[in-house]
Structure formats: C-alpha cells, structure tokens
UniProtKB/Swiss-Prot annotation:
ATP-dependent serine protease that mediates the selective degradation of mutant and abnormal proteins as well as certain short-lived regulatory proteins. Required for cellular homeostasis and for survival from DNA damage and developmental changes induced by stress. Degrades polypeptides processively to yield small peptide fragments that are 5 to 10 amino acids long. Binds to DNA in a double-stranded, site-specific manner. One of its GO terms (biological process) is cellular response to heat. Residues 10-20 have a biased composition (Acidic residues). The gene is lon. Residues 26-222 form the Lon N-terminal domain. Belongs to the peptidase S16 family. This is Lon protease. It is found in: Cytoplasm. It comes from the Bacteria. Its main location: cytoplasm. Keywords: ATP-binding, Cytoplasm, Hydrolase, Nucleotide-binding, Protease, Serine protease, Stress response.
C-alpha cells in the first residue's frame, strides 16, 4: 500500500536553533524494544546485571540515567561487553523509585526527561557509562504548525472512536498539549506505532518533522483500520442466510429429539400462519399479520427481534375483529334491570331508555351518542353503566383515567420502544373479547396534562362517532373499528373537561340523594348486599329505620351512599364476629341482633356530624349560605364582626379570589346604601370589618355567596338578627341585583338535610325548581328573589330603619351597631 500523501510535506520550519547544552556523564541502561519517550513515566522490574548496577549507582548519585533501545537480538552483545555501535539518540530519564526485592530484582519507576545525543561510551564494567549532550526542543510557531497539530489531534479522536475503551482523560490530555514535539512524543505511545516507528520518531530531533512523521503513520493506520472494518462487514453479508437457518433448524431438530419431544409437532411459523388464515378479520388485518409473519420466518425464531414480532402477532390474533350478532333490545326488560339496580334517578333512567329505544329502531344507522354521567362520588355513575350492559346483554369493560398524563396510555407506544404495548383502549377490547361492549371511561375529569402529550386529544378520536370506526393505535398501526362500542364517560365535575371533549358527549347530571332516597337505597340494596357478603341472614341481623336515619344524618355527610355502605358493612362485621363467637361458645346460633340507634353508637362510637338546623337561634352578623362541592352540597355559616378601627376589611377562612371580590362587592353595595339601612356613613371610616367563613382549613371559592355576605354585613352593622331557619344562595351586583347560580339541587339537598325551612334562590333559577326531588319541594319553602331588598325582607328578623326615619332602636347616634341582643 502506498503511503498516504501528506498535506504538510512542504511545511516550513519556523523555529530557532537550539542552544548547545553542556555534556553529561550518565550511567546507561539498555532496554529492549520498549521505547520510553520524554514526558512518559513507566514502571519496570529490572533483573540483576549491568542495567541493575547502573540504576543502583544512579540512585546513589543524581538519579539520572540514559536509556537506549535496541532490538532483542542486540541485547546479548551489551550483556557480554561487546556492544555494537551505540545508537545516536537516547533518552535521559530520572529514577522516581528504586526498590530492591527479595528475589534479587528491583522495582523501578522511570520518568522520561529529554532526548540526548550520545557521544561515546566511557565505561563498560561493572555498568555502562556514556558521555551525552541533552537536547531540548526549540520553540516553534506558525499557522502551518497549528494546522498540523490540529490534524493529528483529529486523527487521535478518530482512532479512539474506532478502538473504544480509551479513558476520556487521556484524550483530553492530548488536546491540551500545545507543543508539536511534545504532542508527537505522547501520541507515539499509542497502539498505531510499532518499535520501528517509535525509534524513528525518537531519532528525529526537529519537532515539526517529528510530528509530520507521526501524522503519516496515523494516516496509514487509519486507512488500514477502515479497510479492515469494511472487509468484516462484507464478509458478514456474504454469509448465506438460508444456509445459516438450515444449520439452526437441524440443531433444533436434534435438541427436540434428545429431549424426547414430538418431531412431528407443528412448526411455530406454520401454526401462526394457520391461525391468521382462520382469523375472522378484514383483509388488511390479515395482510399486515402475514407481512409480519414473513419477517419472523426470515429472521428465525431465535432472533432477538422475533419476540417483538411474536408478541405483535399474538395481539392481532387475540383482538375481536369480527362483527357479532347482538341480542334484541327489550325496553321493558331494560327498565326492569335499571329499577332493580338503582333506586330513584328517574330523569337519568328516562334518558337511558330513550337512548335504547332509538338504538332499537335505528339499528346500525344510528351514530351512538357518547353519554357522560356527571355527579358526586357514590351516586351510582359506574354501576349505571354496568346496568346498561346487563340490560343490553353486552360485555362490560371499564378503564379508569384518573391521573393519566401520557397520550401513549390511550394510543399505546410504537413498537420501536422496548416493552411497547397497546394503549388502554385496545387492551380493554382484548379483555372484553367483544367488538361491541359497554365501555365505561371513568374519571375523565381527572386526566392530567404534561410534556408527554395531552391524553384528552387522543380521546377525541375515540369518542367521535365520525372517526372511531378507524381508531389507530400506535402499537398496532392497523385501523380498529370502535363504532359498535357504547362509550359512557363519568366525571365528578364538568369544568375540568376540555371543551372539545365535552362537545362530543351528551351530559347527564346525576345529583345527590335525599334522605328518603338514601333510606330506601339502604333498605333495598345496601343492607341485603352487605348481609350476604358477610354471611349473615335476615334472622341474624335487622336494622331499624331510626338506626339507618342516624347513620345517614350523624355518621355520613355525602351526596351518594358510598360512605353509608361502609358504615353498614362495619356494623355487619361486628355482628358477624359476635355470631361466630357465641356459636363457638354455645354450639347454637344466637338470637337476632337488632341494630337500633343505641347499637349504632355502641359499635361505631360517638356521632361524627351534627344534624339539625344551621344555627340554634337568630344571631346578629351570622347568615347561613350553601355551597356546592364535589361530594354534593354543604351549608356555610358566614360571620361578620365590626369593631373600632380605620375602615379596613379583613377576610379569613381560605377564601378564593372570586369570594374575596364578592365580599368587596357586598361592602361597596352596603356603603352606597348606608342611609337606607340606618347606618352612619362615618362607620365605614371608623370601623374595621372582619368576615370569616368556617371551616378555616377548607378552601372556598364561589360567587353564589354574594347575597349571604351582604345579608350578614347589613345584620352586623345594624344590629338586626338573621333568621336561623333561612338559607340563601345567589350572586350580588353593585346595584343589588341577584344573579343566577349553579348546583341548585345539591344546595337545596344540603339545606334540607340541615333542617332549613326557608330557602332563598335567584329568580332566574326558578325554572330549575321542577327538577328538585318532590320531598324537597314539599318541605322546603323555596322563594325566588331578584334584588337584595327582597332578600333582606325574608332573611332579617326585621327591616333596618332608614337614617331619616330611625328611632334609635338599631343604631346609636354615631351610626355604630348597638350591642347584640341577649343570647346572641
């Protein structure tokens, strides 16, 4: 091979002539074909002989020795005092360590210092000593020198890339060298150089010429290295794949025969091919499966990638591709199932039956709407979906989406990833073993969003009737028909659901249960279920109506019945234990356990919640409001306390920005109408107002507390008590208008549960009264209002006297509130 052309053949030498150094007389050490360059440190083990004695003497003197390097066949001449011609150049090295060992040898560490021109040998025994003149590289500069150094460093990087396993610190050290001679000496110690190359570099005194020789050697070795890699790749490709597989199959056949397995058994490839042909699926699915099977056959079953392909084929074979014959929809039977599984929820059941009726008449022509049940926890959203599946005679599957943050959870991961799998939609379809199940997407309002994508965007395709007939999972990469699936979503709140996703669903709101409904649900569903679950019979345990009501009122506070079921289960466990213990002791069943109110307290401990009216008596500065929560509704006692100060407004109770603005609106409204309420205008300059909404640890943010805040504020500043049996909800404006609110059913249920008898609501919400439970409408005096004046006439025990007509019964002559009545 011709030596590579050098870009630096005509490189000018721009350096000064070195100054001649004084001669030195040093002990000489003869090494074999191991060249130690200047700037290198090498450990050696030296046997007895001339070199041993030379180092021993040097260790006693100034520790410097002269190293020369000769071929192996020349060593004998130096050992027998008959050396051939001394080499022209050696290396002055310093002994860093000289340790004599028990076996007569010495362990030494040599550090190369500089080159030296050898003049003559002046001593032969008992060791060699020579006259020499040290040589130091002259300083050099110039763009060409920099270019040459940069090129050599790039060659070093390329060599490291091919060889690998080179410490990064060594590469960085090479890049920090800024002298050409030093760079040449260090690089020469690499694996690309043999003894001849290193000796040639050592004998070259000119630093630029020395580096040029290093460049030529590296260039030649890199070409050889690339050629060697290419030859290996070509040889590997030439290997006949079919011959390789033949040998592997023969080995497999012999292994099976040795293990005693049936050699006539089906080949895995043939078995998969048979299953694909028998698969009841569209042609494009079979074609994709056969294409992957061909890849599997070409690679062989023992190829690392064969496991990925085999898993992919197993997924295709396990999915329900074929249309199935569905049972006839019976509206009467569906109604029986819904009534048997759920008490109440008449509006919801009516909408479900309408949906089933249209599906019965329209058949496949109907694009199924996506139902979304929205309501507090424990009201039966998921169990409604299970009942629909039972009524239709379809399979039921459920996927919880709470906390899902990765789009791949819905669409799956691409097969390029290790451990890739289909998304939750395809996994659920596989588990259902049906192409048309009832599919519950639970907690769609709890889906998260982060850097991995937006899962709700993937759900858009799933829930769109115009698109889901060709749903594409990233893992399968084959369209899958979801149009026959009845999707039902559930959520606790509507606001967190993105608008595009909400637009694809028909919202059906499920409110909380009334006390009577909970009583009937406990009697008809929860108690029989828990009694059977705990191995009890009707003859062993009985719940009185008073006990059930006590559980509802004083041990649970929820819109649904999940907590009620837990308390019933707890009572059943306690009774089951007593039945088991008494049966073991007496050998016969004990008498029936009757769970009454006293037994509830005995087994469950003291009451956890206070049941009754919101306040025990009419109070000044305290008004009862209602709030909507994810668990239903709850009452709020809003407290206002004025005291002498500088007109500051203080708000406590973890109020949100909206509620803080409602409080400021209430203060501004009352201040603008101070004369109408008999309040001295100076009161607002000389009085601090503190508004507090218990419980302090619970965050609150709702504009519907506006009229409640205003009522409590007017009551506190005029000394007029607020009626204890009145609750209210509504947003107030600066002009005293009452604006509509949401969650009326939950709020009225909370007020009814708390024993409130009069409920003030915005006039624009009067249309929603018909949606309230009959018992609530019958027992709660619902009064729609449109202004604060109407609210005050109902909520206050008496109307405040205007300033121009007051008799001093409500405010003093400074307009400050009178002391609260006794007992408030």
């Amino acid at each position: 091979m011709n030596e590579p052309m050098s870009l630096f053949d005509d490189l000018p030498e721009e350096h000064d002539e070195p100054q001649e150094a004084p001669e030195r007389r040093l002990p000489m050490v003869v090494l074999g074909e191991m060249v130690i360059m200047p700037h290198m440190t090498i450990p050696l083990q030296v046997p007895q002989g001339k070199s041993y004695r030379a180092m021993e003497r040097a260790w006693e003197e100034d520790r410097d020795v002269l190293l020369i390097f000769v071929r192996e066949h020349q060593l004998e001449g130096y050992k027998s005092n008959q050396p051939q011609n001394l080499p022209p150049i050696g290396v002055i090295a310093q002994l860093q360590e000289f340790a004599k060992l028990n076996d007569g040898t010495a362990r030494v560490i040599l550090e190369g210092q500089s080159r030296a021109q050898i003049i003559e040998a002046i001593q032969i025994t008992p060791f060699y000593r020579v006259r020499c003149r040290p040589y130091t590289d002259p300083p050099v500069s110039g763009l060409e020198v920099e270019a040459l150094m940069e090129t050599v460093k790039q060659q070093v990087d390329e060599f490291v890339e091919h060889l690998g396993e080179v410490p990064q610190e060594a590469v960085q050290f090479v890049h920090r060298i800024d002298r050409p001679g030093h760079l040449a000496d260090i690089v020469t110690w690499g694996p690309a150089f043999d003894f001849k190359d290193r000796l040639e570099v050592l004998n070259t005194l000119d630093p630029v010429e020395r580096l040029r020789k290093v460049y030529l050697v590296l260039a030649r070795q890199l070409e050889l290295l690339k050629l060697r890699v290419k030859i290996q790749q070509d040889t590997k490709e030439v290997l006949d794949q079919s011959q390789r597989e033949y040998f592997l199959r023969e080995q497999l056949r012999i292994i099976r025969r040795e293990l005693g397995e049936d050699e006539e058994g089906d080949d895995p490839i043939d078995e998969l091919r048979r299953k694909i042909h028998e698969l009841d699926a569209p042609e494009y699915v079979k074609n994709q499966a056969l294409h992957e099977l061909k890849r599997l056959a070409q690679q062989g079953m023992n190829n690392p990638e064969s496991g990925v392909i085999r898993t992919y084929l197993d997924w295709i074979l396990s999915l329900p591709w074929a249309d199935e014959e569905l049972p006839e929809i019976s509206i009467t039977e569906a109604q029986k199932v819904l009534d048997a599984d759920h008490y109440g929820l008449e509006k919801v059941k009516e909408r479900i039956l309408e949906y089933l009726a249209v599906r019965k008449l329209a058949g496949d022509k109907m694009r199924s709407p996506i139902l979304c049940f929205v309501g507090p926890p424990g009201v039966g959203k998921t169990s409604l979906g299970r009942s629909i599946a039972r009524a239709l005679g379809r399979k039921f599957v459920r996927t919880s989406l709470g906390g899902v943050r990765d789009e791949a959870e819905i669409r799956g991961h691409r097969r390029t990833y290790i451990g890739a799998m289909p998304g939750r939609i395809i996994q659920a379809m596989k588990n259902a073993k049906s192409k048309s199940p009832v599919y519950i997407l639970d907690e769609v309002d709890k889906i998260g969003l982060d850097f991995r994508g937006d899962p709700t965007s993937a759900l858009l395709e799933v829930l769109d009737p115009e698109q889901n007939n060709a749903f594409s999972d990233h893992y399968l990469e084959i369209p899958f028909d979801l149009s026959k699936v009845i999707f039902i979503a559930t959520a606790n709140q509507l606001d967190p659901i993105p608008l595009p996703l909400r637009d694809r669903m028909e919202i059906i709101e499920i409110g909380g249960y009334t006390e009577d409904e909970k009583l009937e649900i406990a009697r008809g569903f929860l108690i029989p279920k828990q009694r059977e679950f705990h191995g009890l019979t009707e003859d062993q345990i009985e719940f009185t109506e008073g006990a059930i009501l006590k559980l509802i009122r004083e041990y649970t506070r929820e819109a649904g019945v999940r907590g009620l079921e837990r308390e019933i289960a707890s009572l059943c466990r306690k009774v089951a234990r007593q039945v088991a213990e008494q049966t073991e002791a007496n050998g016969e069943l004990p008498p029936k356990f009757v769970i009454d109110e006293a037994a509830v307290v005995k087994y469950l401990g003291p009451e956890r919640y206070t049941y009754g009216i919101a306040e025990e008596q009419d109070e000044v500065g305290v008004a009862t409001g209602v709030a909507w929560t994810s668990a239903g509704g709850d009452i709020l006692s809003i407290e206002v306390l004025p005291f002498k100060g500088k007109g500051q407004l203080q708000l406590t109770g973890q109020l949100g920005e909206v509620m803080k603005e409602s409080a400021q609106t209430a203060v501004s409204y009352v201040r603008s109408r101070a004369a109408d309420f008999g309040i001295d205008p100076n009161t607002f300059e000389e009085t601090n107002i503190h508004i507090h909404i218990p419980e302090g640890a619970v965050p609150k943010d709702d504009p519907s507390a506006g009229i409640t805040l205003t009522t409590a504020l007017i009551s506190a500043l005029t000394g007029t008590p607020v009626r204890r049996d009145v609750a209210m909800t509504g947003e107030v404006t600066l002009r005293g208008k009452v604006l509509p609110i949401g969650g009326l059913k939950e709020k009225t249920l909370a007020a009814h549960r708390a024993g409130i008898r009069t409920f003030i609501l915005p006039k624009e919400n009067a249309k929603d009264i018909s949606e309230l439970p009959e018992k609530v409408r019958r027992e709660l005096n619902l009064i729609p209002v449109s202004s604060m004046d109407e609210v005050l006439r109902i909520a206050l025990s008496r109307m405040p006297t205007p300033a121009n007509n007051q008799n001093g019964s409500h405010t003093n002559n400074r307009g400050q509130p009178s002391p609260a009545p006794a007992g408030t």
